[in-house]
C-alpha cells in the first residue's frame, strides 16, 4: 500500500501519533483542551461526538468509604493501645458473615455446623414422630427431647425389669436356712464371762433350751431333750443337722469347741452317737411309769416331787443329770469354775431328795399302788431296766431305784 508523501514527514507523523493516542484514551480519561481555540479543540469535539460522554470513575462506593473510615478508627485504637469498643467490631463481623453467604451460598439444612442433624423448627416440642408428617404435639420434658409418654418408648420393654434393690440382700439358700434356726443362733451367742471365747454346746437343742447358761456350768436349769419321746429326738436331729451344715459352710467361728478342742472330730461318729442316744432315750420314755399308777397324793412325804414336776410328775421325770454332763468338760482349767458350780448345784439337789429316797422300799414288787401290768413291765429283762440318772457328784447317797427287781 502506497503511503502519501506528506505522512512521511516528521511533523505529519507526530500529529498522527498524537491523534491516535488521544482517541484511544477518551473513554477512560477526561481530556481538556490545551487552548481555547485550535485544532485540538475541534478534534476533541469530533471525538466526543463519535464516543458517548464518559462518567467519572469513583474508586470506592459510599459503603466502602464508611467501612474504610471505621477501619481507620480501629487502627487508631490499636496504635494507642486502648481496647477497641465492641460497637466497632460487631459491624465488621456481620459484614464478614454476609460476605461468606454471598460467595459460598446458603448452607443446606442437612449439612453445615450441625454435622448432619436437622434443625428443630420447634425446640420445646416433643420430637417423637412416625417417620412422616405426624409429630407429637406435647411439650418435651426439661431434660429430654421427648415428653413423659414417649421418653422410654425407645427402650426394649419386652423383658422384665431387673430388680436391683434385692440383689445386695440376696444370700445363698443354704445360708438362709441355717440363719433361720433359732437354737443355732442361741448357741453362737452364748459366751462365758471369764474366758472370753464363744462356748458352743455340743447339742444345739440343749444350748437353745438353757437360755444364757451355755454348755458349761448350767446344770441347774438344763432340761434334757432325751426325756421326751421320739418327737424330741427328731427335733434334735434337725437342729444338729443345721449346725453341721452351718459349720460345713464356713459359718462357724474359729473357736468352735467341737472342732478345735482336740482336733477335727468326725461328723459321722458324732451323728452315730446322737442316733444311739436318741434310741436309748426313746426306749426309756416308753417304759416310764404312768402318772396314774404312782400318785403323789398317796404319799404326803413325797411332796418335794410336786415342786419339781407338778401334778403329773413321775419317777422317770426326775432330772437326768448323768447324760447332761457338760460336753465341754475336756477344756481343762478354763471351765473349772463352771464345773464346780454345776457339781455344787447337783449336790444341793441331791440333798433335797435324800429324805425320801432312803424311805423307799428296796424291791419294786413291794411298791404299793402298782398294777399287775406295771409289775409285768418291771419283770422285763435287765437289758431294758429303768435307769434313773442321778448326778454322780452327790456320792453320799445310793440310788435304790436303779437296781433290777430280780436282784433282791
Curated annotation (Swiss-Prot):
Tagged with keyword Nucleus: yes
Residue span(s) of domain WRC: 120-164
Biased amino acid composition, Low complexity: 166-178
Nucleus listed as a keyword: yes
Tissue occurrence: Highly expressed in developing leaves.
Gene Ontology process terms (BP): DNA-templated transcription; leaf development; positive regulation of DNA-templated transcription
GO MF entries: ATP binding
SMART domains according to UniProt: QLQ
Positions with biased composition (Basic residues): 150-159
Cellular compartment(s): Nucleus
Keyword field: Activator, Nucleus, Transcription, Transcription regulation
Compositionally biased residues, Basic and acidic residues: 139-149
Span list, region Disordered: 139-178
PANTHER family in the cross-refs: GROWTH-REGULATING FACTOR 4, GROWTH-REGULATING FACTOR 5
Family: Belongs to the GRF family.
Record text on subunit structure and interactions: Interacts with GIF1.
Name by which UniProt lists this protein: Growth-regulating factor 1
Species the sequence originates in: Zea mays
Gene name tied to this protein: GRF1
Amino acid at each position: 500500500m502506497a503511503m502519501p508523501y506528506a505522512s512521511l514527514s516528521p511533523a505529519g507523523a507526530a500529529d498522527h501519533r498524537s491523534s491516535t493516542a488521544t482517541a484511544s484514551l477518551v473513554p477512560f480519561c477526561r481530556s481538556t483542551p490545551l487552548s481555547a481555540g485550535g485544532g485540538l479543540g475541534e478534534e476533541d469535539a469530533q471525538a466526543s461526538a463519535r464516543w458517548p460522554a464518559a462518567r467519572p470513575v469513583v474508586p470506592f462506593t459510599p459503603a466502602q468509604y464508611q467501612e474504610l473510615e471505621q477501619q481507620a478508627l480501629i487502627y487508631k485504637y490499636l496504635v494507642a493501645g486502648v481496647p477497641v469498643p465492641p460497637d466497632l467490631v460487631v459491624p465488621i463481623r456481620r459484614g464478614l458473615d454476609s460476605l461468606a453467604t454471598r460467595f459460598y451460598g446458603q448452607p443446606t439444612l442437612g449439612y453445615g455446623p450441625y454435622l448432619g442433624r436437622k434443625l428443630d423448627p420447634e425446640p420445646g416440642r416433643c420430637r417423637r414422630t412416625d417417620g412422616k408428617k405426624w409429630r407429637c404435639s406435647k411439650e418435651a420434658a426439661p431434660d429430654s427431647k421427648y415428653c413423659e409418654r414417649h421418653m422410654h418408648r425407645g427402650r426394649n420393654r419386652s423383658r422384665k425389669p431387673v430388680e436391683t434393690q434385692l440383689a445386695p440382700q440376696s444370700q445363698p439358700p443354704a445360708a438362709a436356712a441355717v440363719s433361720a434356726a433359732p437354737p443355732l443362733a442361741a448357741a453362737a451367742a452364748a459366751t462365758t464371762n471369764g474366758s472370753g471365747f464363744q462356748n458352743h454346746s455340743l447339742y444345739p437343742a440343749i444350748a437353745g433350751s438353757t437360755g444364757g447358761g451355755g454348755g458349761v456350768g448350767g446344770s441347774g436349769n438344763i432340761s434334757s431333750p432325751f426325756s421326751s419321746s421320739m418327737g424330741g429326738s427328731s427335733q434334735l436331729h434337725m437342729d444338729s443337722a443345721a449346725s453341721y451344715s452351718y459349720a460345713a459352710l464356713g459359718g462357724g467361728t474359729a473357736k468352735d469347741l467341737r472342732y478345735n478342742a482336740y482336733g477335727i472330730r468326725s461328723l459321722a461318729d458324732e451323728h452315730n452317737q446322737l442316733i444311739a442316744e436318741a434310741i436309748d432315750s426313746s426306749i426309756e420314755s416308753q417304759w416310764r411309769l404312768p402318772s396314774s399308777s404312782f400318785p403323789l397324793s398317796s404319799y404326803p412325804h413325797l411332796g418335794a416331787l410336786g415342786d419339781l414336776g407338778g401334778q403329773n410328775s413321775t419317777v422317770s421325770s426326775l432330772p437326768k443329770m448323768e447324760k447332761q454332763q457338760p460336753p465341754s468338760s475336756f477344756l481343762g482349767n478354763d471351765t473349772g469354775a463352771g464345773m464346780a458350780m454345776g457339781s455344787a448345784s447337783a449336790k444341793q439337789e441331791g440333798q433335797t431328795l435324800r429324805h425320801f429316797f432312803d424311805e423307799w422300799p428296796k424291791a419294786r414288787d413291794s411298791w404299793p399302788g402298782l398294777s399287775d401290768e406295771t409289775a409285768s413291765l418291771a419283770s422285763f429283762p435287765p437289758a431294758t431296766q429303768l435307769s434313773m440318772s442321778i448326778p454322780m457328784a452327790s456320792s453320799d447317797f445310793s440310788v435304790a431305784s436303779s437296781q433290777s427287781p430280780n436282784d433282791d
